[in-house]
């Protein structure tokens, strides 16, 4: 790309990077972000620890940057802030990638070559050899991410760092699972689970490609036997209530089908379905292949005795369900379209609902996939929520909801159907292995369906600060939805299940209460190294009891002071898994006073309008960010490009605008020469305007409106300064009065440059930990009082002046006059008094002569706290320049039949 187009000259980028590196080194050298317990109010913020199977990109960076902005802002408000970080090294993805490198998989090796090349490694082959051990992948990228985070200026306390592979942490996870088991939440039973055939292992969201943003779940189908005189066809459906409306069966003419023995029945399914059935049942065996043509020659009978033909349809996916589909044209849009090509006439209607197929045909475009999908969604919704069965034998009159469950139960009970599980979408693991649903006979899971646990979780959410508020109901719904969750696998990296070490605790279940360990990691590590971190010690630290040694005592104090987490910040895809497990495990294990206090859910990130992926070529790594743009420019982009809850689009065209304003800021600051002499009127207006902006900024930041806050305090202040200077203010005098507080406000976002200018112009302390004065507003009020105004009154002054200028220009535009002089007549004291009386409905005899005029201009009357004539005379030269005419300013009442009212002078142009 053309760097100069978005980032200025190469020399500018070098200067930025030198400043970045200078202050990153200083912060680390002086342990600036390693807080100790003190008398201040504490604030603990956590962001999900990164998974260490590769480099992080611009999308990941948004979440961590937002977390750092909030942490830094809280320091500026004199909170004792802990912002810790660790690394997630559990699960199967790291192991799978390592195995693929060991097996010589070309695509995996190419991927890791690109990672290593980006990090500037010379001995790439040597590193690839090391990556055959999965622990080396995890450790390499943990260290790489630390460097990425440091280069972005994150104010993380790295002394508390640990990983999910650390043995002391695994002791904590074992303690956690014993606690869950004691509460009856750990179960072992037959259970359907997402499964990788190649890896021979259960998988979860963290293991599946795009599993966090494009969820994959287990769906339960009713697989129905359609019988003939020699074998059955098995057709799987989510809607058994439509069986009375079947007209035919669809199969794919080019698909491969297989005859199998399932229980005591002979049946036919697609070749792909055989593997799925084998992983779900132990009574399936293959007899042999069967052609689509031979299937089509037969007729089959529904479970309710209706004989139906078999038709070919290329829309049938043999890798979805059983590869056999029964057709209900009156209640399936795709069936309707395809059936109409084969047959004409009426088809049986078995569900009465508001939306019917004839209306669907009119309302939606059934010639496009988008139209078909939209129509399908609307029809299913109408029938599910409002439909009742008709022409359906004994089930007639039942609602769709009730009929679905009853028909399913009856069919399975009579041996005419079985349960079949399928993934909600096609999925592969991060390593590329196909994901199916398997039923494991001895699966371990956490039972999240317990009523007492759901109640505690709802109690937690209802007392928690959640931003945006709209996600409170979403979180409560997610808690209600959760049932049993598989928590262990046969292979992978991580902690052994304490009561069955053949199993490894899966990666979403070993990372739920880990924020508590940040508070105690230093002491727990020492206890473990000394052989003293057993479950009793962990219990004493987290759950009370008499401590046994100084390390336990210190750990207990750290936990008591820092916990709970005040803000957990994560992205919206984590609601249904990470966040729900986080809430419910805290509810199960900790008392209410240690429950998380707040939750911020950020939006997604796209790049140039598209989902970020290597295949689209729009992945920008965090390392690339700091090399191309500098940390502060990226941080500013994250802050102002989108609201926290909105989708952020990483777009270099937008970046160029931010760089331009950032360079404007740098030019102003680099040329600044402090001047503390007395302020004139325009400079006092600027300072007062800043004071009001600063109050607004704090309110916005306290409400996590980060975008609005920095548009206000960064862009707004730059604009105000330019405006004031154009009106006669000294840039140096104006800045001198606000520079310390402006840099404090900018520090959370443009952290490195704020630190640079703080040291250059303010103090040798660190602005990163130099909070605002609690009484910061008083100094600005003192400056404003020189002119007899408060800062809020000064804030209105220039708005008033600009409105007068706008009124003059409007008159010029409407009349077409080329003005030579403008006479502005401001309401005199009599009119001002009369206006106040008029607005309060108590008009004196003296004021009644103005009553008819005031009544006509009621909406124009604004009684300002300042003297209008004084303000306009002070600004007469400016007004004259703006309207390009001589300006005179007087007071009066009624001029040529018009009254000058407070806030709206009479303007006469010649």
Curated annotation (Swiss-Prot):
Keywords: Aminoacyl-tRNA synthetase, ATP-binding, Cytoplasm, Ligase, Nucleotide-binding, Protein biosynthesis
GO molecular function: aminoacyl-tRNA deacylase activity; ATP binding; leucine-tRNA ligase activity
UniProt-listed Enzyme Commission number(s): 6.1.1.4
Name recorded for this polypeptide: Leucine--tRNA ligase
InterPro entries cross-referenced by the UniProt entry: aa-tRNA-synth_I_CS, aa-tRNA-synth_Ia, Leu-tRNA-lgase_arc, Leu-tRNA-synth_Ia_arc/euk, M/V/L/I-tRNA-synth_anticd-bd, Rossmann-like_a/b/a_fold, tRNAsynth_Ia_anticodon-bd, Val/Leu/Ile-tRNA-synth_edit
Motif 'HIGH' region: chain residues: 50-60
GO cellular component: cytoplasm
Family designation: Belongs to the class-I aminoacyl-tRNA synthetase family.
PANTHER family: LEUCINE--TRNA LIGASE, CYTOPLASMIC, LEUCYL-TRNA SYNTHETASE
Keyword Aminoacyl-tRNA synthetase: yes
Superkingdom in the source lineage: Archaea
Cellular compartment(s): Cytoplasm
Cross-referenced SUPFAM superfamilies: Anticodon-binding domain of a subclass of class I aminoacyl-tRNA synthetases, Nucleotidylyl transferase, ValRS/IleRS/LeuRS editing domain
Segments carrying motif 'KMSKS' region: 611-615
UniProt KW Kinase keyword: no
Pfam family, one: tRNA-synt_1
Main location, first listed in the record: cytoplasm
One example of a Gene Ontology biological process annotation: leucyl-tRNA aminoacylation
Catalysed reaction, written as an equation: tRNA(Leu) + L-leucine + ATP = L-leucyl-tRNA(Leu) + AMP + diphosphate
